[in-house]
């Protein structure tokens, strides 16, 4: 089964998405948190054996350097260098944001003009950009990246990881649906509580994606950085009141 996640247009596009979730000025965001989310995302791609292009890895190296500088004792020279690296990164993200807004503006104008001509509009390179903002897919994947990172730490500490030859997505789909029996909703991270190893965690996630794809499940996230809940797809589904 081929489940495709929407790729970002590059590392700056991913960073911009992460920064935008804070809904504040780019220069005020908690950069260490953003770096950790970026690294978790890249690590998850690798764990799922999805291709990670070189530019993402180069950026990951730069981010790890910035993070390490921020964790060092506050010696003046080191602090200045760390601040310079951080400010340079934030400036790159800000410039990319402006470029992307310009691209979206040009695309809107292009579509507006196309209404007055009979021929089909020419495709622009920005056409795929709006799919990046699909919260259902992207926020789910980013949330899963954080869950997987925590589960890896848990497995490393336990030293009792149970391995199996193979996990089937079809079997995991049944487990996911059974987890919702008698519940209005299930918090995403609770789905992975009983998982015994990384491969089981990943297969559970792929099963969840497939159930969303087939519209058997829906996602609910009431606010940025809030918990993501899984719910069975029903007609005119309502978010249960707390």
UniProtKB/Swiss-Prot annotation:
Reported function: Participates in chromosomal partition during cell division. May act via the formation of a condensin-like complex containing Smc and ScpB that pull DNA away from mid-cell into both cell halves.
Location within or outside the cell: Cytoplasm
Family statement: Belongs to the ScpA family.
GO CC, any one term: cytoplasm
Entry protein name: Segregation and condensation protein A
Superkingdom field: Bacteria
Keywords: Cell cycle, Cell division, Chromosome partition, Cytoplasm
Cell division recorded as keyword: yes
Gene3D superfamilies named in the record: 6.10.250.2410, Structural maintenance of chromosome 1. Chain E
Oligomeric form and interacting partners: Component of a cohesin-like complex composed of ScpA, ScpB and the Smc homodimer, in which ScpA and ScpB bind to the head domain of Smc. The presence of the three proteins is required for the association of the complex with DNA.
InterPro entries linked to this entry: ScpA, ScpA-like_C
UniProt cross-references to Pfam families, sorted A to Z: SMC_ScpA
